């Protein structure tokens, strides 16, 4: 399901007095959808590229500080939409977009991770195989994953025509296991839609 933040990125506000008011309204509406999904016994996966991709796509005119303030608000609204849902039923996917561009303006994981970790979710899926973000397993040396969360690093690159050798995939997961408890790791792909 789309997060309130990503909806606001792809369907810009043209009605409400402020972006914050728009996000609040989206949060209230999406809370209904999220509850219906989990009430049906399904796992809720939230797509949240607004917390990474939107930095260089939509909010490039903002200073980094102002973007991070915006990201805080997006997490606040997301959490408001999730208040009645057990976090163990929620996955959140963060990405910088799976297009084949240079990604030279991507915001680093170390800058957004402290904000992302405030989300009331259990499972966090991140891109980590593409060449621009493959090194970011190291971020978890300094920013510890809370004990109540499970990281799903993308260990398969969804933007390449190459099929990775099984040892490459295993080594990517092993890198993460050096900085995160193995019980808190689950292999995934770089794309939340894969």
Please describe what each predicted stretch is.
Residues 1-194:
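Domain-level signal for soluble alpha/beta catalytic cores
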